[in-house]
Amino acid sequence: MDSTAGSDASTPTNHTVSSKKRRGRPPKGSYAAYGSSDDDDEEYSGRTRRRNRNTRPRVSAPSSSSTVVPKDLYSHRATLEDDELNFGVVDPEGEKKVNELGYLNGGREYRCRTFTCLGRGNRLYMLSTEPARAMGYRDSYLLFLKHRSLHKIIVDDSEKWDLIERNIIPHSYKGRAVGIVAARSIFREFGARIIVGGRRIVDDYWEGEFRARGFVEGELADPDDKLPPPGMPYNRNQYVAWHGASAVYHPQPSLEAQLPAAARKRKKEPPKDATWLFQHAKATAAYNNDITKYLVQKQDIGYFEPHTNLLHVPLNTQPTKTHWIQAKTGTECPAPKLDILVALNSDVAPQVSIANIPPSVYASCPLHVQEAIRKRQEQEIRSIRLNSMY
């Protein structure tokens, strides 16, 4: 609608337009309806034409994960027949790939589990959650919301107990609403994407529609699907909730991917021919060093024994006997003095004694260093004598 029409529709005929410009930005709609002068119309005329011009719609390339159905499919009135919504539109080539009960022809296999239901004949059905997860949906609600050609069936108690006895659903589902869907309608909706190793047009139901939209014949419909080696069965349990189906839409990163980039690069690079033995020896020495440090720390702290709820220490680190000397009667003994010696023991390196070092070795050291060495030698000699007495 142009600005003149908007002015006639929104402005009374007896309204007097002021010649004074209004302050502020004009509204996004018609400028004539805003009560502006002719100068205002000329000022914003180019802007109005630029805003209202029609843009060309973008044409996107066909996606391998898109669902293709005839454009006029939903314009027909649907009727419920054999647990399916029948729109009265079929593809002659697609009918050759599946029969009326949902069984596939030509050696094709469904990616999800199929089964028959009690009281519904030999028609094939699927649990609604399994094709939903196979197509990338978190639950069946989104599946039926976005694909209107599918019909959800809620099984009754007798059908539910029959599925439990046949190990199709677990016993914990006895109090829950279980939904199923006809396998034939799933194939009509998703085509090659629901087929094991399905290829476009070759395994699609709406073959003519896929050709018209420019899909490549023979292309894999789902390149991300994990196909088994030749001769091995396809893993249909990956879409079953009680078999870890959450891994389908919650992929976990590998342990190698969680490592830093430098560690991944170092792990991938093979050791050089000239240094591989050195690298192994270096890693082994570091591992042995860690073990030694851990054992020394455990000896200082002790080993916790859960049955006695006590910390146990090695027997060879504890005293085994004591020696008492009785003082003579009538003699006065000086009050004993308590000397506290703080020793810092290294956790890794063993203790080194300097009692047997000759003076010629440290004769060139400063005087205060020589004095410290002599005091340490005297302490060690005194400690050795005390230990030899007991």
Curated annotation (Swiss-Prot):
Residue spans of biased composition, Polar residues class = 1-17
Read off the lineage from the record: Eukaryota, Fungi, Dikarya, Ascomycota, Taphrinomycotina
**Family, per the entry?**
Belongs to the RSC7/SWP82 family. RSC7 subfamily.
- Keywords from the UniProt entry: Chromatin regulator, Nucleus, Phosphoprotein, Transcription, Transcription regulation
Phosphoprotein as UniProt keyword: yes
MF (Gene Ontology):
chromatin DNA binding
Residue numbers spanned by region Disordered: 1-72
Subunit annotation: Component of the RSC complex composed of at least arp9, arp42, rsc1, rsc4, rsc7, rsc9, rsc58, sfh1, snf21, ssr1, ssr2, ssr3 and ssr4. The complex probably interacts with histone and histone variant components of centromeric chromatin.
| Gene, per the UniProt record | rsc7
Q: Where is the composition biased (Low complexity)?
A: 57-70
The protein's location, in the record's own words, is: Nucleus
Matches recorded under InterPro entries = CRC_Rsc7/Swp82
Q: Name one GO cellular component term.
A: nucleus
Q: Which residues cross the membrane?
A: none
Q: What does this protein do?
A: Component of the chromatin structure remodeling complex (RSC), which is involved in transcription regulation and nucleosome positioning. Controls particularly membrane and organelle development genes.
Biological processes, Gene Ontology terms? chromatin remodeling; transcription elongation by RNA polymerase II; transcription initiation-coupled chromatin remodeling
Q: What is this protein's record name?
A: Chromatin structure-remodeling complex subunit rsc7
Native source species: Schizosaccharomyces pombe (strain 972 / ATCC 24843) (Fission yeast)
- Domain of life here? Eukaryota
User: Does the UniProt entry include the keyword Phosphoprotein?
Assistant: yes
Q: Which residues carry this modification: Phosphoserine?
A: S36, S37
Q: Where is the composition biased (Basic residues)?
A: 47-56
